[in-house]
Amino acid sequence: MSNILTEICATKAEFVAERKKQIGNNALLDLIKAQTQPRGFRAALEKKRARGQFGLIAEIKKASPSKGLIRSDFTPAAHARDYEEGGAACLSVLTDRPYFQGHEDYLIAARQAVKLPVLRKDFMIDPWQVTEARAIGADAILIIVAALDDQQMQDIEAAALEYGIDALVEVHSHDEMERALKLKSRLIGVNNRDLRDFSVSFDRTYELVGSAPKDCTFVAESGIRNHDDLVAMQRHDIGCFLVGETLMRQDDLRKATKDLLGLS
């Protein structure tokens, strides 16, 4: 695990411990009962693919540890509508507070504004967070293989399955891919960015995808800049993408999404 990831997970453990004291499990279960049914995150991506279209997960992201503030005029509901109108298949919303200036309320606002499925983008280290994710309406959660041991991954995935939501399992290496494939989820995120030096390489992604079973839905993450990148990846059987910063820095999110997807 990289130093920054170790630090983030340690901070997250403290944060989750405090959240558990503030919000009882029964309160979360009551909120889940009031939620609408999960919208089918992986299914939405596959539906786009079946139509010969790109499956875009458009990310609502205010800031990052490495880049600082990304967007000052930050309105999650409006951004969600722009992404939906631009042709995105799904949304991803950052809810991590200390490092990404995210918040659970951002996911709630975004999901209420659209009909798209929404991923809770956060550092999941405890099944309790999955319960909270469903309570605020998330249709999918993120499992970062580099941050967890096998038992932790299984426990978090089991919670997601219990609530009927998808798990996007993120990998960065062959070893992590092997561990990810021990899980039931076949929604695999391949990060183009090397966490050791933050370099971006699509070649690593192509290699990882080429070595994995064909029953997986692969999502390329990080470093995607334009439509040409999507076309290049499609040649390697990658048709789903998670894009955040590239879009969030644009003035017109709707147009930027269309341009990225080649729909302009």
From Swiss-Prot:
GO biological processes: L-tryptophan biosynthetic process
Enzyme class: lyase
UniProtKB keywords: Amino-acid biosynthesis, Aromatic amino acid biosynthesis, Decarboxylase, Lyase, Tryptophan biosynthesis
InterPro entries listed in its UniProt record: Aldolase_TIM, Indole-3-glycerol_P_synth, Indole-3-glycerol_P_synth_dom, Indole-3-GlycerolPSynthase_CS, RibuloseP-bd_barrel
UniProt catalytic activity: 1-(2-carboxyphenylamino)-1-deoxy-D-ribulose 5-phosphate + H(+) = (1S,2R)-1-C-(indol-3-yl)glycerol 3-phosphate + CO2 + H2O
Secretion signal, residue range per the UniProt entry: none
Pathway given in the UniProt record: Amino-acid biosynthesis; L-tryptophan biosynthesis; L-tryptophan from chorismate: step 4/5
Gene Ontology MF term list: indole-3-glycerol-phosphate synthase activity; phosphoribosylanthranilate isomerase activity
Transmembrane segments annotated in the record for this chain: none
Pfam families registered for this protein in UniProt: IGPS (PF00218)
PROSITE patterns reported in the protein's UniProt record: IGPS
EC number: 4.1.1.48
Protein family: Belongs to the TrpC family.
Protein name: Indole-3-glycerol phosphate synthase
